Design a protein with these regions (language model features):
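Conserved helicase ATPase motor motifs in RecA-like P-loop NTPase domains
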Residues: 25-30, 140-143, 157-185
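Conserved strand-helix element at the start of the C-terminal RecA-like helicase core
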Residues: 61-72, 223-246
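Inter-Walker segment of RecA-like/P-loop motor cores
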Residues: 80-123, 267-269
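SF2 helicase catalytic motif II
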Residues: 127-159
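Interdomain hinge/linker at the junction between the two RecA-like core domains of SF2 helicases
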Residues: 177-223
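Conserved helicase ATPase core of P-loop NTP-dependent helicases/translocases
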Residues: 258-284
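A short beta-strand element within the Helicase C-terminal
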Residues: 293-305, 330
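Conserved SF2 helicase motif VI
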Residues: 308-330
Length: 345
């Protein structure tokens, strides 16, 4: 069956979007970011008129919000749209490259954490900045409910965005936004004419197994052929440290630089620009659970030790199949297994 993308559901509706909330409910790999970059951004540029003649203050501008630094880097690469690798880790160099790219006159990319920081410094100054934008894109919108358990500041970002619903086109999009949808429907603020859904399509998982102890996981990994790659999501940086000692050069380990122990391997040392793993094993915390597309046919095994369904769905979605035959085995840590079976059936 031919794969469908969210642009085929939205069609030309975006041309007539009025102020308010838009909800895009579609799985990983459904083309949500592609729609923004290849359809909405060119439309904003077109509506702004001639770049050299138009008043910069009248430009139609987009603010793209996301929840993780790796995703921000990926979005910045997508805004360039030239297929080249840009120096997203070197701000001074990146700044010059962005100034030479016309697209960045119409779109800015922030993390939700930046919204939170700016609001704490001055709500009034933040509002003046946000007033410049016509469209607010909330990518990985499950951040507002998924991260709130351990980060009370997420509600600040959500409140800031919600205040703009009456004066902006605010686009929420995620593969796992059911809690938000339920809330909006309960309070009567979700218009079904502004809700775009693409049913979940068959994924890449061909077999599901459970394990319950570290030793079981280690034995499973040791049984995997050397030419088959492994993606392993763990819950703590300390586990990454132990895995690094255990597997040596066979493994790369990725976690947030904001972690108490700091960063480990750079993302660019873990995954190449084409989405292929640079080692047999890539182990990571939830810092990698979105914002990274792995397009590697040799990635045949995904181990997940989280039990939150939102996180599990996102982590499975890091593998982007290149065709119908590009499949993998999924291994889930035993905790919460009964609740998680539905994710891959």
């Amino acid at each position: 069956m031919q794969k469908r993308y969210i642009s085929s559901v939205i069609e030309d509706d975006y041309r007539n979007w009025e102020l308010g909330r838009i909800a895009i409910d579609a799985g990983t790999g459904a083309g949500k970011t592609t729609f923004i970059m290849n359809v909405l951004l060119p439309y904003a540029i077109q509506q702004s008129g001639d770049y050299h003649c138009a008043d910069p203050c009248t430009r139609v501008r987009i603010l793209y919000l996301c929840n993780r630094v790796p995703l921000k880097s990926q979005i910045i690469q997508a805004v360039f749209g030239d297929g080249k690798e840009h120096w997203v880790d070197e701000y001074d160099r990146l700044k010059w490259e962005m100034e030479d790219c016309l697209n960045f006159q119409y779109i800015d990319v922030w993390t939700y954490q930046k919204i939170q920081r700016e609001y704490k410094k001055s709500p009034e100054d933040l509002k003046r900045v946000l007033d410049r934008y016509t469209y607010i894109i909330c990518d990985e919108a499950h951040y507002f409910v998924g991260d709130s358990d351990f980060n009370d500041d997420t509600k600040l970002a959500y409140l800031c965005v919600e205040k703009m619903v009456s004066s902006k086109v605010v686009v929420y999009m995620s593969a796992t936004m059911q809690l938000l949808l339920d809330q909006w429907r309960d309070d009567g603020t979700l218009s079904e004419t502004k809700y775009y859904a693409l049913p979940k399509q068959d994924g890449c998982v061909k077999e599901l197994r459970f394990y319950y102890r570290d030793r079981e996981r280690d034995l499973l990994i040791e049984s995997i052929p050397a030419d088959e790659k492994i993606l392993l999501f763990v819950t703590r940086r300390s586990i990454l440290e132990n895995l690094k000692k255990q597997y040596g050069d066979k493994i790369r380990c990725y976690c947030s630089a904001n972690n108490r122990g700091g960063a480990m391997d750079k993302l660019s040392d873990c995954i190449d620009r084409d989405g292929r793993l640079k080692s047999q094993i890539l182990a990571a915390t939830t810092a990698l659970y979105n914002g990274v597309d792995i397009k590697d046919r040799t990635l045949k095994h995904i181990f997940i030790e989280q039990s939150d369904p939102l996180e599990v769905i996102q982590e499975i979605g890091r593998k982007r199949p290149t065709d119908e035959g590009d499949t993998c085995k999924l291994y889930l840590r035993g905790k919460g297994s009964k609740e998680l079976v539905y994710l891959v059936t």
